[in-house]
């Protein structure tokens, strides 16, 4: 019996977030592609305006916990003020937005603190 697209979709829909993330990484490595969204080129005026305007607000996104999960949870609690359960949930469900609308200085400091704890972080 051949595997159908529906079988594949059913299997994927039953994966956990972590398993799905690992699957995407394996696809990226095997096929040499990126899961990043495709950027559509804007007009010349829009590109020049975007380059002149520096971003002032950042979202802190935890992309990977790393090996030191407990240290990362402690860092998340210190940065966000979340309780232990909420911080643990945020760390286990990567990628997750930890804090939105941060200024550049605070965002860079938070990123450095999380990276020191062993996490991988992006500022968006």
From Swiss-Prot:
Subunit text: Homodimer. Part of the ribosomal stalk of the 50S ribosomal subunit. Forms a multimeric L10(L12)X complex, where L10 forms an elongated spine to which 2 to 4 L12 dimers bind in a sequential fashion. Binds GTP-bound translation factors.
Gene: rplL
Stored SUPFAM superfamilies: ClpS-like, Ribosomal protein L7/12, oligomerisation (N-terminal) domain
Stated name of the protein: Large ribosomal subunit protein bL12
Family stated for the protein in its record: Belongs to the bacterial ribosomal protein bL12 family.
Ribonucleoprotein found in the keyword field: yes
Keywords (A to Z) from UniProt: Ribonucleoprotein, Ribosomal protein
GO biological process, any: translation
Gene Ontology MF annotations: mRNA binding; structural constituent of ribosome
Bias (Basic and acidic residues) ranges: 101-114
GO cellular component: cytosolic large ribosomal subunit
């Amino acid at each position: 019996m051949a595997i159908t697209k529906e079988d594949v979709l059913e299997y994927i829909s039953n994966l956990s977030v972590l398993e799905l993330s690992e699957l995407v990484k394996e696809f990226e490595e095997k096929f040499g592609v990126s899961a990043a969204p495709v950027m559509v080129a804007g007009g010349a005026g829009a590109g020049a305006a975007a380059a002149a305007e520096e971003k002032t607000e950042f979202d802190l996104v935890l992309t990977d916990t790393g090996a030191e999960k407990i240290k990362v949870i402690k860092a998340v609690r210190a940065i966000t003020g979340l309780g232990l359960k909420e911080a643990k949930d945020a760390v286990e469900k990567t990628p997750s937005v930890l804090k939105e609308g941060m200024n550049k200085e605070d965002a860079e400091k938070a990123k450095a603190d999380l990276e020191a704890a062993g996490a991988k972080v992006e500022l968006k």
